[in-house]
């Protein structure tokens, strides 16, 4: 009989701010996918990983810790916010801990035998988390729509919202790096239909990214 454990498929989920990533995520959850939230893990690491906190205190002085030894986020933010080099240092220190925690969580969920695990990471590619993913779905939308959505959602001024949009990658960035790009310029119903279509393509084993890489490698070999 089927004593083979069904394969786990890790789905990377990323995209532009305000494009509708969370709606796509909810749709995947309803299909029974397990969930790994990279931002939540990053938060958790900074709060609970004692060795990481010690590393941070060594770099940015003891001022960044509260009396009880927990992280004072406000203090840390004040230090790194206006200083690119310090922000880079912060990321360098905390990064290995986050990656380890994500790896551990993926391993735990694999062992539980989940068919789908969604790795939700706004900076999926920058962080190198794409290497844990069997397939990657990116959610994109027209700039004006994203602007309206984050204005309505995050209580930002128009300037702040504009700045946040400008800091985002263009659609082409995601197209080059993803298996499936979902455009969300329409209703939620349309979006859910697109998710259903993508999921059935994933089910049947479509892996556009791998195919592209294989084709590129072949072309390299020819030259």
Please place each PLM-identified region on the residue numbering.
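Walker A/P-loop
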Residues: 22
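Hydrophobic anchor at the beta1->P-loop junction of P-loop NTPases
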Residues: 13
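Small-molecule kinase domains that catalyze NTP-dependent phosphoryl transfer to phosphate-bearing small molecules
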Residues: 98, 102, 131-132, 152, ...
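ATP-dependent NMP and nucleoside kinases share a basic, alpha-helical "lid"
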Residues: 103-111, 115-152
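ATP-binding Walker
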Residues: 19
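P-loop (Walker A) phosphate-binding loop of NTP-binding proteins
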Residues: 16, 28
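ATP-dependent small-molecule kinase phosphotransfer cores
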Residues: 43-115
């Amino acid at each position: 009989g089927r004593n083979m454990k069904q394969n786990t498929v890790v789905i990377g989920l990323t995209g532009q701010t305000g494009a509708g990533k969370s709606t796509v995520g909810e749709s995947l959850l309803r299909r029974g996918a397990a969930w790994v939230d990279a931002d939540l893990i990053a938060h958790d690491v900074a709060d609970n990983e004692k060795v990481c906190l010690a590393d941070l205190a060594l770099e940015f002085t003891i001022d960044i810790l509260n009396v009880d030894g927990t992280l004072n986020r406000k203090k840390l933010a004040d230090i790194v916010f206006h200083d690119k080099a310090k922000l880079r240092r912060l990321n360098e220190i905390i990064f290995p801990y986050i990656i380890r925690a994500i790896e551990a969580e993926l391993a735990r969920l694999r062992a539980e035998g989940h068919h789908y695990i969604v790795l939700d990471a706004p900076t999926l590619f920058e962080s190198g988390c794409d290497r844990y993913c069997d397939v990657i779905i990116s959610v994109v939308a027209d700039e004006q729509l994203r602007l309206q959505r984050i204005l309505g959602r995050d209580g930002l001024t128009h300037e702040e919202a504009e700045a946040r949009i400008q800091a985002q990658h263009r659609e082409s960035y995601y197209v080059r790096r993803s298996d499936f790009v979902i455009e969300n310029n329409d209703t939620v119903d349309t979006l859910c239909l697109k998710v259903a279509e993508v999921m059935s393509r994933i089910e049947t084993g479509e892996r556009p990214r791998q195919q592209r890489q294989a084709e590129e490698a072949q072309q390299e070999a020819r030259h």
